Protein backbone atom coordinates (compact mmCIF):
# COMPACT_ATOMS: atom_id res chain seq x y z
CA UNK A 1 0.00 0.00 0.00
CA UNK A 2 1.56 3.28 -1.08
CA UNK A 3 -0.86 5.61 0.67
CA UNK A 4 0.67 8.98 1.34
CA UNK A 5 -0.23 10.63 4.63
CA UNK A 6 1.22 14.00 3.73
CA UNK A 7 -1.11 16.97 3.82
CA UNK A 8 -0.49 17.53 0.12
CA UNK A 9 -2.42 14.39 -0.79
CA UNK A 10 -5.72 15.20 -2.47
CA UNK A 11 -7.21 11.77 -1.89
CA UNK A 12 -8.31 11.34 1.69
CA UNK A 13 -11.37 10.98 3.90
CA UNK A 14 -11.16 11.89 7.57
CA UNK A 15 -7.86 10.56 8.88
CA UNK A 16 -7.62 7.80 6.28
CA UNK A 17 -6.15 8.16 2.82
CA UNK A 18 -6.82 6.40 -0.45
CA UNK A 19 -4.24 3.82 -1.48
CA UNK A 20 -1.90 5.11 -4.14
CA UNK A 21 -0.66 1.64 -5.11
CA UNK A 22 -1.86 -1.88 -4.36
CA UNK A 23 0.16 -5.07 -4.86
CA UNK A 24 -1.01 -8.61 -4.12
CA UNK A 25 2.00 -10.74 -3.15
CA UNK A 26 2.38 -14.52 -2.94
CA UNK A 27 5.44 -15.75 -1.07
CA UNK A 28 6.53 -19.38 -1.48
CA UNK A 29 9.34 -20.12 1.02
CA UNK A 30 9.54 -23.78 -0.05
CA UNK A 31 10.38 -23.10 -3.70
CA UNK A 32 11.86 -19.70 -2.80
CA UNK A 33 9.64 -17.81 -5.26
CA UNK A 34 7.66 -14.58 -4.95
CA UNK A 35 4.84 -13.28 -7.13
CA UNK A 36 3.83 -9.61 -7.29
CA UNK A 37 0.56 -8.70 -9.00
CA UNK A 38 -0.25 -4.99 -9.18
CA UNK A 39 -3.94 -4.13 -8.97
CA UNK A 40 -5.29 -0.92 -10.49
CA UNK A 41 -6.27 1.50 -7.76
CA UNK A 42 -9.18 2.67 -9.95
CA UNK A 43 -10.67 -0.82 -10.36
CA UNK A 44 -14.44 -0.71 -9.88
CA UNK A 45 -15.29 -3.05 -7.00
CA UNK A 46 -18.27 -3.96 -4.85
CA UNK A 47 -17.57 -3.13 -1.20
CA UNK A 48 -20.78 -4.61 0.16
CA UNK A 49 -22.45 -2.22 2.58
CA UNK A 50 -20.28 0.60 1.23
CA UNK A 51 -21.50 0.10 -2.33
CA UNK A 52 -19.51 0.24 -5.55
CA UNK A 53 -16.41 2.39 -5.64
CA UNK A 54 -12.81 2.55 -6.77
CA UNK A 55 -10.63 0.02 -5.01
CA UNK A 56 -8.39 2.67 -3.49
CA UNK A 57 -11.39 4.10 -1.60
CA UNK A 58 -11.41 0.98 0.59
CA UNK A 59 -8.47 2.31 2.60
CA UNK A 60 -10.15 5.67 3.12
CA UNK A 61 -13.41 4.02 4.20
CA UNK A 62 -12.23 1.10 6.29
CA UNK A 63 -8.45 1.15 6.44
CA UNK A 64 -6.32 -1.93 5.96
CA UNK A 65 -9.10 -4.30 7.06
CA UNK A 66 -11.51 -3.27 4.31
CA UNK A 67 -8.71 -3.10 1.73
CA UNK A 68 -7.63 -6.67 2.51
CA UNK A 69 -11.24 -7.90 2.45
CA UNK A 70 -11.95 -6.19 -0.87
CA UNK A 71 -8.75 -7.36 -2.59
CA UNK A 72 -9.33 -10.90 -1.32
CA UNK A 73 -12.83 -10.90 -2.80
CA UNK A 74 -11.60 -9.46 -6.10
CA UNK A 75 -8.76 -11.96 -6.44
CA UNK A 76 -10.66 -14.93 -5.07
CA UNK A 77 -7.84 -15.85 -2.68
CA UNK A 78 -7.40 -15.68 1.09
CA UNK A 79 -4.95 -13.02 2.28
CA UNK A 80 -2.96 -13.96 5.37
CA UNK A 81 -1.11 -10.73 6.07
CA UNK A 82 -0.75 -7.14 4.97
CA UNK A 83 1.85 -4.40 4.99
CA UNK A 84 1.56 -0.73 4.17
CA UNK A 85 3.99 2.11 3.85
CA UNK A 86 3.69 5.79 2.99
CA UNK A 87 5.87 7.68 0.52
CA UNK A 88 8.17 9.11 3.17
CA UNK A 89 8.69 5.70 4.76
CA UNK A 90 9.46 4.16 1.38
CA UNK A 91 12.07 6.83 0.71
CA UNK A 92 13.62 6.30 4.14
CA UNK A 93 13.90 2.54 3.59
CA UNK A 94 15.84 3.02 0.36
CA UNK A 95 18.14 5.55 2.02
CA UNK A 96 18.64 3.29 5.05
CA UNK A 97 19.83 0.57 2.67
CA UNK A 98 22.36 2.96 1.16
CA UNK A 99 20.35 3.14 -2.04
CA UNK A 100 19.29 0.33 -4.37
CA UNK A 101 20.69 -0.65 -7.75
CA UNK A 102 18.08 -0.37 -10.51
CA UNK A 103 18.36 -0.47 -14.29
CA UNK A 104 15.99 2.42 -15.09
CA UNK A 105 14.20 1.47 -18.35
CA UNK A 106 13.98 4.96 -19.85
CA UNK A 107 14.76 8.58 -19.09
CA UNK A 108 12.08 10.19 -16.95
CA UNK A 109 11.12 13.86 -16.90
CA UNK A 110 8.07 14.21 -14.70
CA UNK A 111 7.78 17.20 -12.40
CA UNK A 112 4.55 15.81 -10.95
CA UNK A 113 6.53 12.78 -9.76
CA UNK A 114 9.40 14.83 -8.40
CA UNK A 115 11.85 15.48 -11.22
CA UNK A 116 14.31 13.79 -13.58
CA UNK A 117 15.96 10.37 -13.83
CA UNK A 118 18.50 9.21 -16.37
CA UNK A 119 18.03 5.83 -18.01
CA UNK A 120 20.39 2.96 -17.25
CA UNK A 121 21.90 0.98 -14.39
CA UNK A 122 22.47 3.16 -11.33
CA UNK A 123 22.14 3.30 -7.56
CA UNK A 124 19.00 5.22 -6.67
CA UNK A 125 18.58 7.29 -3.53
CA UNK A 126 15.25 7.34 -1.74
CA UNK A 127 14.13 10.47 -3.59
CA UNK A 128 15.14 9.01 -6.94
CA UNK A 129 13.43 5.69 -6.26
CA UNK A 130 10.29 7.61 -5.38
CA UNK A 131 10.39 9.47 -8.71
CA UNK A 132 10.57 6.15 -10.56
CA UNK A 133 7.74 4.66 -8.50
CA UNK A 134 5.44 7.67 -8.86
CA UNK A 135 5.94 8.69 -12.48
CA UNK A 136 2.99 8.22 -14.84
CA UNK A 137 3.13 11.21 -17.18
CA UNK A 138 6.56 10.27 -18.53
CA UNK A 139 4.70 7.41 -20.24
CA UNK A 140 1.79 9.40 -21.70
CA UNK A 141 2.80 8.67 -25.30
CA UNK A 142 3.00 4.94 -24.65
CA UNK A 143 -0.41 4.29 -23.15
CA UNK A 144 -1.66 3.44 -19.67
CA UNK A 145 0.75 5.29 -17.38
CA UNK A 146 -0.44 3.33 -14.36
CA UNK A 147 0.78 0.06 -15.89
CA UNK A 148 4.28 1.44 -16.47
CA UNK A 149 4.39 2.97 -13.01
CA UNK A 150 3.30 -0.33 -11.46
CA UNK A 151 6.04 -2.16 -13.39
CA UNK A 152 8.61 0.30 -12.05
CA UNK A 153 7.30 -0.15 -8.51
CA UNK A 154 7.77 -3.90 -8.77
CA UNK A 155 11.25 -3.30 -10.20
CA UNK A 156 12.26 -1.21 -7.18
CA UNK A 157 10.67 -3.62 -4.69
CA UNK A 158 12.66 -6.42 -6.31
CA UNK A 159 15.84 -4.37 -5.93
CA UNK A 160 15.07 -3.76 -2.25
CA UNK A 161 14.44 -7.48 -1.71
CA UNK A 162 17.69 -8.37 -3.47
CA UNK A 163 19.72 -6.04 -1.28
CA UNK A 164 18.18 -7.30 1.95
CA UNK A 165 18.22 -11.00 1.07
CA UNK A 166 21.78 -11.04 -0.28
CA UNK A 167 23.21 -10.15 3.13
CA UNK A 168 24.44 -12.67 5.70
CA UNK A 169 21.91 -13.86 8.29
CA UNK A 170 23.02 -11.52 11.08
CA UNK A 171 23.12 -8.44 8.85
CA UNK A 172 19.79 -9.34 7.28
CA UNK A 173 18.13 -9.69 10.69
CA UNK A 174 19.46 -6.35 11.93
CA UNK A 175 18.44 -4.67 8.66
CA UNK A 176 14.88 -6.00 8.87
CA UNK A 177 14.71 -4.87 12.51
CA UNK A 178 15.85 -1.35 11.57
CA UNK A 179 13.51 -1.04 8.59
CA UNK A 180 10.43 -2.26 10.47
CA UNK A 181 9.83 1.23 11.87
CA UNK A 182 8.79 2.42 8.42
CA UNK A 183 6.22 -0.31 7.77
CA UNK A 184 2.77 -0.94 9.26
CA UNK A 185 1.97 -4.66 9.26
CA UNK A 186 0.18 -7.38 11.22
CA UNK A 187 3.35 -9.51 11.16
CA UNK A 188 5.67 -9.72 14.15
CA UNK A 189 9.29 -8.72 13.61
CA UNK A 190 10.39 -12.26 14.41
CA UNK A 191 8.07 -13.60 11.70
CA UNK A 192 9.46 -11.17 9.12
CA UNK A 193 13.04 -12.10 10.00
CA UNK A 194 12.19 -15.80 9.81
CA UNK A 195 10.56 -15.37 6.41
CA UNK A 196 13.52 -13.33 5.15
CA UNK A 197 15.91 -16.07 6.25
CA UNK A 198 13.97 -18.73 4.32
CA UNK A 199 14.04 -16.50 1.21
CA UNK A 200 17.75 -15.66 1.55
CA UNK A 201 19.59 -15.75 -1.76
CA UNK A 202 16.47 -15.11 -3.84
CA UNK A 203 17.39 -13.80 -7.30
CA UNK A 204 14.77 -11.28 -8.52
CA UNK A 205 15.61 -12.01 -12.16
CA UNK A 206 14.55 -15.65 -11.91
CA UNK A 207 12.65 -15.99 -8.63
CA UNK A 208 10.21 -13.07 -8.71
CA UNK A 209 7.22 -13.24 -11.05
CA UNK A 210 5.15 -10.14 -11.72
CA UNK A 211 2.23 -8.76 -13.71
CA UNK A 212 -0.63 -6.25 -13.71
CA UNK A 213 -4.32 -6.92 -13.26
CA UNK A 214 -5.94 -6.98 -16.74
CA UNK A 215 -8.55 -4.24 -17.04
CA UNK A 216 -10.37 -2.02 -19.52
CA UNK A 217 -10.85 1.71 -18.92
CA UNK A 218 -14.47 2.85 -18.89
CA UNK A 219 -16.12 6.23 -18.38
CA UNK A 220 -19.14 5.87 -16.07
CA UNK A 221 -21.20 8.82 -14.80
CA UNK A 222 -18.39 11.29 -15.52
CA UNK A 223 -15.75 9.17 -13.76
CA UNK A 224 -13.04 6.95 -15.26
CA UNK A 225 -12.85 3.44 -13.83
CA UNK A 226 -10.81 0.33 -14.57
CA UNK A 227 -13.10 -2.62 -15.25
CA UNK A 228 -11.60 -5.99 -14.37
CA UNK A 229 -11.34 -8.34 -17.37
CA UNK A 230 -12.86 -11.26 -15.46
CA UNK A 231 -11.84 -14.17 -17.70
CA UNK A 232 -8.22 -13.02 -18.08
CA UNK A 233 -8.05 -12.24 -14.37
CA UNK A 234 -9.34 -15.68 -13.36
CA UNK A 235 -6.77 -17.31 -15.63
CA UNK A 236 -4.01 -15.16 -14.12
CA UNK A 237 -5.01 -15.91 -10.52
CA UNK A 238 -5.31 -19.63 -11.27
CA UNK A 239 -1.71 -19.60 -12.47
CA UNK A 240 -0.61 -17.64 -9.40
CA UNK A 241 -2.35 -20.10 -7.05
CA UNK A 242 -0.55 -22.95 -8.78
CA UNK A 243 2.81 -21.29 -8.16
CA UNK A 244 3.21 -20.40 -11.84
CA UNK A 245 4.06 -16.96 -13.26
CA UNK A 246 0.92 -14.79 -13.75
CA UNK A 247 1.48 -14.81 -17.53
CA UNK A 248 2.87 -17.52 -19.78
CA UNK A 249 5.50 -15.19 -21.25
CA UNK A 250 7.24 -11.93 -20.49
CA UNK A 251 5.34 -8.87 -21.68
CA UNK A 252 7.72 -6.24 -22.98
CA UNK A 253 7.06 -2.74 -24.26
CA UNK A 254 9.95 -2.06 -26.61
CA UNK A 255 9.13 1.62 -27.07
CA UNK A 256 9.68 2.43 -23.39
CA UNK A 257 12.07 -0.49 -22.75
CA UNK A 258 9.79 -1.64 -19.93
CA UNK A 259 9.05 -5.21 -18.87
CA UNK A 260 5.38 -5.20 -17.88
CA UNK A 261 5.21 -8.84 -16.81
CA UNK A 262 7.98 -11.24 -15.78
CA UNK A 263 8.07 -15.03 -15.75
CA UNK A 264 11.47 -15.66 -14.17
CA UNK A 265 13.23 -15.71 -17.52
CA UNK A 266 15.90 -13.34 -16.25
CA UNK A 267 14.84 -10.65 -18.72
CA UNK A 268 15.07 -7.12 -17.37
CA UNK A 269 14.49 -5.03 -20.48
CA UNK A 270 13.75 -5.47 -24.18
CA UNK A 271 15.25 -8.41 -26.02
CA UNK A 272 15.60 -10.03 -29.40
CA UNK A 273 14.23 -13.13 -31.06
CA UNK A 274 16.42 -16.14 -31.88
CA UNK A 275 17.02 -14.81 -35.38
CA UNK A 276 18.35 -11.54 -33.97
CA UNK A 277 15.30 -9.44 -34.83
CA UNK A 278 13.74 -7.31 -32.15
CA UNK A 279 10.78 -8.76 -30.30
CA UNK A 280 7.41 -7.20 -31.05
CA UNK A 281 6.22 -4.72 -28.45
CA UNK A 282 3.43 -5.89 -26.18
CA UNK A 283 1.03 -3.00 -25.71
CA UNK A 284 -1.42 -2.25 -22.93
CA UNK A 285 -4.78 -0.55 -23.37
CA UNK A 286 -8.09 -1.18 -25.07
CA UNK A 287 -9.38 -1.09 -28.64
CA UNK A 288 -12.98 -1.16 -29.87
CA UNK A 289 -13.34 -2.73 -33.32
CA UNK A 290 -16.46 -1.93 -35.35
CA UNK A 291 -17.44 -3.69 -38.58
CA UNK A 292 -18.25 -0.92 -41.03
CA UNK A 293 -18.24 -2.99 -44.22
CA UNK A 294 -20.68 -5.82 -43.52
CA UNK A 295 -18.16 -8.56 -44.35
CA UNK A 296 -18.83 -11.57 -42.13
CA UNK A 297 -15.90 -12.34 -39.84
CA UNK A 298 -14.06 -9.10 -40.59
CA UNK A 299 -14.24 -7.93 -36.99
CA UNK A 300 -12.93 -11.23 -35.65
CA UNK A 301 -9.89 -11.30 -37.91
CA UNK A 302 -9.04 -7.65 -37.26
CA UNK A 303 -9.44 -8.18 -33.51
CA UNK A 304 -7.01 -11.09 -33.57
CA UNK A 305 -4.35 -8.99 -35.30
CA UNK A 306 -4.75 -6.19 -32.76
CA UNK A 307 -4.71 -8.61 -29.82
CA UNK A 308 -1.32 -9.84 -31.04
CA UNK A 309 0.01 -6.37 -30.21
CA UNK A 310 -1.11 -6.87 -26.60
CA UNK A 311 -4.33 -4.83 -26.53
CA UNK A 312 -7.62 -6.00 -25.06
CA UNK A 313 -10.21 -5.85 -27.85
CA UNK A 314 -14.00 -5.60 -27.89
CA UNK A 315 -15.82 -5.93 -31.22
CA UNK A 316 -19.23 -5.19 -32.70
CA UNK A 317 -20.93 -3.55 -35.69
CA UNK A 318 -20.59 0.08 -36.72
CA UNK A 319 -23.60 2.36 -37.19
CA UNK A 320 -23.59 1.42 -40.89
CA UNK A 321 -21.81 -0.84 -43.39
CA UNK A 322 -20.99 2.04 -45.75
CA UNK A 323 -17.50 2.98 -44.60
CA UNK A 324 -15.18 3.06 -47.65
CA UNK A 325 -11.92 3.31 -45.69
CA UNK A 326 -10.71 1.71 -42.47
CA UNK A 327 -10.17 4.24 -39.69
CA UNK A 328 -8.07 4.02 -36.53
CA UNK A 329 -9.31 6.83 -34.30
CA UNK A 330 -7.61 8.25 -31.22
CA UNK A 331 -8.51 11.17 -28.95
CA UNK A 332 -5.09 12.27 -27.70
CA UNK A 333 -2.17 13.42 -29.86
CA UNK A 334 0.17 11.36 -27.67
CA UNK A 335 -1.51 8.23 -29.05
CA UNK A 336 -0.96 9.06 -32.72
CA UNK A 337 2.05 6.78 -33.21
CA UNK A 338 0.29 3.86 -31.55
CA UNK A 339 -2.77 4.39 -33.74
CA UNK A 340 -0.56 4.19 -36.81
CA UNK A 341 1.01 1.03 -35.39
CA UNK A 342 -2.48 -0.53 -35.23
CA UNK A 343 -3.16 0.52 -38.83
CA UNK A 344 0.15 -1.04 -39.88
CA UNK A 345 -0.79 -4.29 -38.13
CA UNK A 346 -4.11 -4.34 -40.00
CA UNK A 347 -2.40 -3.64 -43.32
CA UNK A 348 -4.95 -0.95 -44.19
CA UNK A 349 -6.39 2.10 -42.58
CA UNK A 350 -5.81 5.70 -41.72
CA UNK A 351 -4.90 6.90 -38.23
CA UNK A 352 -6.86 10.04 -37.39
CA UNK A 353 -7.55 12.15 -34.33
CA UNK A 354 -11.16 12.26 -33.20
CA UNK A 355 -12.83 15.49 -34.29
CA UNK A 356 -15.76 14.89 -31.97
CA UNK A 357 -17.73 12.80 -34.46
CA UNK A 358 -16.96 9.48 -32.78
CA UNK A 359 -17.97 8.38 -29.29
CA UNK A 360 -15.89 5.64 -27.67
CA UNK A 361 -14.59 4.77 -24.21
CA UNK A 362 -11.62 2.65 -25.26
CA UNK A 363 -8.13 3.97 -26.01
CA UNK A 364 -8.69 3.50 -29.74
CA UNK A 365 -11.64 2.95 -32.09
CA UNK A 366 -11.16 0.94 -35.27
CA UNK A 367 -13.88 1.11 -37.93
CA UNK A 368 -13.35 -1.42 -40.73
CA UNK A 369 -14.11 -0.08 -44.20
CA UNK A 370 -14.55 -1.76 -47.57
CA UNK A 371 -10.77 -1.62 -48.10
CA UNK A 372 -10.50 -4.42 -45.52
CA UNK A 373 -10.39 -7.72 -47.40
Question: What do the PLM-derived regions correspond to, one by one?
Answer:
Residues 93-172, 176, 180-183, 204, ...:
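Flexible, polar/acidic helix-loop-strand segments at domain edges
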Residues 17-22, 31-39, 50-52, 66, ...:
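Extracytoplasmic
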Residues 56-118, 166, 183-192, 199-204:
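Amphipathic, coiled-coil-like alpha-helical scaffolding segments used for oligomerization/assembly
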Residues 290-293, 301-303, 311-373:
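BRCT (BRCA1 C-terminal) domain core and associated BRCT-interaction motifs
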Residues 8-13, 52-61, 76-81, 119, ...:
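Second-shell loop/turn segments in exported
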Residues 19-21, 36, 52, 64-72, ...:
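Extracytoplasmic/secreted envelope proteins and their assembly/folding machinery
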Residues 5-6, 187-282, 302:
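C-terminal solvent-exposed extensions
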Residues 1-31:
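Entry/capping segment at the start of metal-dependent catalytic domains
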Amino acid sequence: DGSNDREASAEFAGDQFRSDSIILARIDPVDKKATLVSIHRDTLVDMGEYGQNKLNAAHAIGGAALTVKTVSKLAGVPISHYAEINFDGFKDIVDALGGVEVDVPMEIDDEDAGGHLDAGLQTLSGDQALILCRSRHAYDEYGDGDSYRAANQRLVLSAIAKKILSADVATMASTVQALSQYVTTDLEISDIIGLAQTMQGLDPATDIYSAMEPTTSKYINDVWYEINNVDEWKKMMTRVNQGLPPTDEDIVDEMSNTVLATTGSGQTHSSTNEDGTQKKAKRTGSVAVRNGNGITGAGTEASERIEELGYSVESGNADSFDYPKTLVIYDDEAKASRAQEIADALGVGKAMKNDGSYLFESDFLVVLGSDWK
